[in-house]
């Protein structure tokens, strides 16, 4: 496809976004505007963490190209300097650019409200430093139970954030879901890398627990209420090819 035929959107409202829009025009592509009902693009540059999360939860027709995110994203200067290569990578292999499919999680609380997550899903006690008991049901191993302030389930995009701070590993695209206890009561509690589906529940009635999705509180969770977290969709994205290995953390791959 010729550059002039490409429909490219840049989502964001700061100076970085304007820089990218100028680069898209200079590269000869057609700059388009996306709305909640119109996402017909060949590529969408998303500027910043929040914008990228929203785009992944509400994917466009074409590939998402994250810019200015902590990981799995390009820097603004790199994206502008490699604009033609990024367009080329939409159709063929380009050195230093990887085309991936990123998992989007559906979070089913057993109520009519079904949520979507791009980065992570956490169950945490409503008040800080309050212990509850949680269980994790996996598809390929026995159920795990532990006492902690909470538990977080993260996609590769979110694995370097809250889950990593809680002791979970950073995983590359296609590496599965990270499951990490938050401030566990006992030492020696593992983090896990799971497949595409886990079920989390609260096993004690003492402390109120809230459901946090991509950093926002979405619901309260009652005792023994199963929260099903499952990959139900994958979104195409262009990201920088990894050049270094993440530092090792103890984990168990399922």
Features from the language model and the residues they span:
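Catalytic phosphate-donor-binding core of small-molecule kinases
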Residues: 2-37, 69-150, 157-254
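Short, well-ordered secondary-structure micro-motifs within conserved domains or adaptor modules
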Residues: 34-58
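Conserved acidic residues
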Residues: 40-42, 62, 149
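Redox-cofactor binding/interface segments in oxidoreductases and associated redox assembly factors
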Residues: 46, 66, 153
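A short, gly/pro- and small-residue-rich
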Residues: 54-71
């Amino acid at each position: 496809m010729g550059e002039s035929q490409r429909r490219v959107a840049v989502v964001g409202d700061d100076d970085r976004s304007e820089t990218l829009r100028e680069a898209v025009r200079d590269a000869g592509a057609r700059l388009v505007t996306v709305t909640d009902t119109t996402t017909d693009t060949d590529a969408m540059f998303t500027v910043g963490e929040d914008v990228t999360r929203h785009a992944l939860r509400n994917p466009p027709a074409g590939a998402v190209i994250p810019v200015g995110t902590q990981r799995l994203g390009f820097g603004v200067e790199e994206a502008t300097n490699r604009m033609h290569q990024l367009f080329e990578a939409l159709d063929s292999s380009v050195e230093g650019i990887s085309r991936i499919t990123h998992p989007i999680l559906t979070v089913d609380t057993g109520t009519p409200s079904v949520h979507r997550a791009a980065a992570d899903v956490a169950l945490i006690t409503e008040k800080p430093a309050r212990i509850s008991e949680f269980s994790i049901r996996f598809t390929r191993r026995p159920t795990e139970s532990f006492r902690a302030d909470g538990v977080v389930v993260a996609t590769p995009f979110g694995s370097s954030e809250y889950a990593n701070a809680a002791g979970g590993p950073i995983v590359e695209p296609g590496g599965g879901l990270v499951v990490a206890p938050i401030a566990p009561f006992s030492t020696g509690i593992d983090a896990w890398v799971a497949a595409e589906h886990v079920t989390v529940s609260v096993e004690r009635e003492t402390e109120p627990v809230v459901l946090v999705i991509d950093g926002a509180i979405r619901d309260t969770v009652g005792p023994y209420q199963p929260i099903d977290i499952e990959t139900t969709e994958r979104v195409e994205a262009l990201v920088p090819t990894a050049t270094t290995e993440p530092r090792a953390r103890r984990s168990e791959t399922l």
